Each structure stands twice: as C-alpha cells, then as structure tokens.
Amino acid sequence: MRSPRMRACAKSVLLSHWVFLAYVLMVCCKLMSASSQHLRGHAGHHQIKQGTCEVVAVHRCCNKNRIEERSQTVKCSCFPGQVAGTTRAQPSCVEASIVIQKWWCHMNPCLEGEDCKVLPDYSGWSCSSGNKVKTTKVTR
C-alpha cells in the first residue's frame, strides 16, 4: 500500500508529464501551421525567389473551330533589367530589351526541337514542329 505522500508525488509527476506533453503538442502544431502557411503563402504576402516566376492561374478552353486556347497568369520576381517572359515554354525572367523590341525568339520560348517565328504583326510568336504549331500572343 502506498503512503499519501507517494500518491501525491505520483500525481505531481503524472500531471507534469501531461503538461509537458500538451506543451510539446502545442509547439508541434504551431510549427506545422507555420510551415503549411509558408508553403501556401499568405494572400498578398507570398514572396517568390527573385529571378523566378510561378503560374498563379491557368485557363483552358476550345473555340468553335476546335482549336484549344490556353492562357495563364504568372507572378514573377525579376532582377533589375528583367521582365516576365517565356523560356523553353515555361514562365521566366528575361532581359527587358527582348520584350521592349519584340524580339520574342531571343528569349528561346520554344521547346527543344521546335522552330520559333515571330508573328507578322510582332504581337507574339509561334513554335512549330512537324505539322504542329503553337501560337502565343502577348497581352499585358
């Protein structure tokens, strides 16, 4: 049989274990919450690495001629002298002079093996391979 003093000591140890466990659980929850918020980003506060771009929205549809139309919204954090562009069919930061002068093919927008041609009105470019042609028109 245990003495009242031993019972009080056991209760105290048990209580301190529960308090410690609750504290560890709270710390873990805060760390997990902070890391998931960092991955998701805060609306309006999300920072991306300088010199990179990320797609924030994609839109896709077909017109009446069964031609697929795609558009995307991109968020970039470019270095000074750079602007949002396209390299190897992915959003990227490119030299501003390429965009200003509309030398679209100088940013290498097409995939490996595709030919790049600037559209006649300089509004974008086309990438072609065999009988497949992808046309990109720049909008701001």
From Swiss-Prot:
Family matches, as InterPro entries: Chemokine-like_TAFA, TAFA_chemokine-like
Location(s), subcellular: Secreted
UniProt keyword annotations, A-Z: Secreted, Signal
Family statement drawn from the similarity comment of this UniProt entry: Belongs to the TAFA family.
Organism placement in taxonomy: Eukaryota, Metazoa, Chordata, Craniata, Vertebrata
The name this protein goes by in its record: Chemokine-like protein TAFA-4
Designated gene of the protein: TAFA4
Species of origin: Macaca fascicularis (Crab-eating macaque)
Organism domain of life: Eukaryota
Listed Pfam families: TAFA
